[in-house]
A protein has these predicted regions:
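Residue-level detector of extended alpha-helical repeat arrays and alpha-solenoid scaffolds
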Residues: 2, 43, 80-81, 120, ...
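Hydrophobic residues within the alpha-helices of tandem HEAT/HEAT-like
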Residues: 5-16, 34-35, 49-57, 73, ...
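HEAT/HEAT-like alpha-solenoid repeats
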Residues: 20-35, 59-74, 98-112, 138-154, ...
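Short inter-helical turns and helix N-cap capping residues of alpha-solenoid HEAT/ARM repeat scaffolds
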Residues: 38-39, 73-77, 115-116, 157-158, ...
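Acidic, Ser/Thr- and Gly/Pro-rich intrinsically disordered linkers and low-complexity segments
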Residues: 87, 197-199
């Protein structure tokens, strides 16, 4: 049954950390996908399963935020902004572990797709802030979607949102290395040279500056 499947997914929170890390990017979205299921028992199982992942979080800063993160995942319209603010205001001194990232990433995705430029800006800021706090292996499964979302924010009409998105992209490239972004610089240069994309060129110019700053000035050679 769907309920049994969700409970099984929740039990995977107690896997060996290495096994869990490899599976989180698949497990958590499946649980989130049935949080609003038409069947009450399935919703309850999904809620309980998600809480299990909150229980295995090792980052003490995120542990304190688990209640608001879970509320934002369950009712994004109502709580996303509050969760983003809580993440921005938190001073992290420990690495963000896989289970922490699995919860945070859903808040970021929701913020990136919000109609408010300010909400997108907050989501981008969190991406930039967390880049140095996350193990590369934990971030890789989410990377392509994050890049796509940040690049959309880079062409937002609001300058502050564009600038924050550009900084987030620069932080990701600096943390993960150019090899993870093989076509990024050529793509940004193509946009800069395309006179038909005047609205996108500002964002691309800012992003290119941040990326080159992250990689080092030798990239200008």
């Amino acid at each position: 049954t769907k309920r049994g499947s969700v409970q099984l997914l929740g039990n995977m929170a107690y896997l060996d950390p290495t096994q869990l890390s490899n599976s989180l990017s698949t497990i958590v979205p499946q649980i989130v996908g049935v949080l609003n299921d038409s069947h009450k028992e399935v919703r309850k199982a999904a809620d309980e399963s998600l809480k299990r992942f909150g229980e295995v979080i090792r980052n003490p800063e995120i542990q304190r935020l688990v209640p608001i993160l879970l509320k934002a995942i369950g009712d994004p319209t109502k709580y996303t902004e509050e969760a983003l603010d809580a993440l921005i205001q938190t001073q992290f001194v420990h690495y963000i572990d896989g289970p922490s990232l699995a919860l945070i990433i859903h808040i970021i995705h929701r913020g990136m797709h919000d109609r408010s430029a300010n909400t997108k800006r907050k989501a981008c800021k969190i991406v930039g802030n967390m880049a140095i706090l996350v193990e590369t292996k934990d971030l890789i499964p989410y990377l392509q979607q994050l890049i796509d979302e940040v690049e959309i924010a880079m062409v937002d009409p609001v300058p502050n949102t564009r600038a924050t998105a550009a900084r987030a992209l620069g932080a990701l490239v600096e943390r993960l290395g150019e090899d993870q972004f093989p076509d990024l610089i050529p793509r940004l240069l193509d946009t800069l040279n395309d006179e038909t994309k005047s609205g996108d060129r500002l964002g691309s110019a800012q992003a290119l500056a941040e990326v080159i700053s992250g990689l080092g000035l030798s990239k200008l050679d």
